[in-house]
Amino acid sequence: MKQQNLLSKTIILLSLFFFAALNSHQLKAFKKEMKIAAVGDCLISWKVSHIKDPRFLNLVELLRGADCAYANCETTFFDAGKGFPAWKTIDPNQFCQPWGADEFKWMGIDLVSLANNHTMDFDYDGLFSTLDNLDRVDIKYAGAGEDLDHAGQPGYVETGAGPAALVSCSAFLPEKNFQASLSHPHMKGRPGTNPINTELTLRVNLETFALLKEARDNILKDLGANVPVKDIKEIDTLDYRWMKFTKGDHTEVLVKPDEKDLERIYSSIKTAKRNSRIVIVTIHEHNGDYKNKKPVKYQADFSRKCIEAGADLFICTGPHELWGLEIYQGKPIFHSLGNFFFQESRLISAESYQRYGLPVYTLDPSLSAEKVDEYFKNPGIWESVVPIVVFDSENKLKEITLYPIFLERNYPIYRRGIPYLAEGEKARSIIEGLKKVSKPYNTNIVFKQGVGKVAL
């Protein structure tokens, strides 16, 4: 009996020693640097895995060399012949054939955000096709799902340096039916994206406000409606159905977010932090000061509160331009990461053709969006950076290297909008541009050996 007890105790002690050693080994594995690569908006329409240009292949190696590579997937992976486009008030319906997920995987992308205004471009069939194809190639995601609980939950990817999490939301969803809704015991929720509902107001100077009031009053009079006799001094706002104007001393976009949505997202960040080593938070937002390349006030405040809630890296997507980099409480905030892929869809819906004043039977693949939309002539949408963010063994920010890229708009349509590493003066120009728009945040960026280095 004594021998059996002694044997049992020996087995228990050996087991404890084994598990302690195993746990120690695992902790050592996580007590190492963690490298995150991040890219911005990805609108991909053509295969890229066949490209042999070293400027592209070296960029791909940067993504593959990171512990985790993140991207904003601003398209649907969907066979458009098997479904139909959703009705949209603005923007063409964006899609890529299911092989797009394989191209992402080939590039080394591990984690994607789906909370944006294109995820639902082919309605629920398109959404579920995108989710299925990402699952098929084992790319993790956040920001969309079968209901609001699934759309709002973090996505996790396991890495050799520990798990990374993603929380993704969108404040730009013109079609409210693209938003996911809650399920309850008696009815399933609506599939869709993870929203931040907002109320938009345009602040204008007194002169513009007076002109707007006069125009509104004249329209109402012409329609035979009763016009309230009020002096401009007596009113603070004007409502034009979907638009609201308020008086001020300058022009500014004011966005008021739904506080319940914000609290829901902060809660998701805290959950992600408990279950992962590094937490990435992304927002998709189109409102902002495009002239000065600055986010609206609520977004800047939101990004900092996300850091306070546990985010290690905050990224805004949507403006399709490179805006400023801020370091807040030792964590990076990219106020807009610009484009990574910006390819035109090979087919768009009939409504989109009509919106551009084109015959609905136009199927010319050589048609350039530049011919129908001045926006595409903006040089800022054709260049950006790929940041490589390194956290040390204690999860403190150690290093940020900014690799400048360009998406050559003068290439043939099948090669346009593909990222290439920039070199020489082009590289310097991109980094100097980012340095300029990051100055208000007291972020010091140095151009050195073809890349940007952030002084920490």
Residue ranges and their predicted role:
Residues I11-A21:
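Bacterial N-terminal signal peptides
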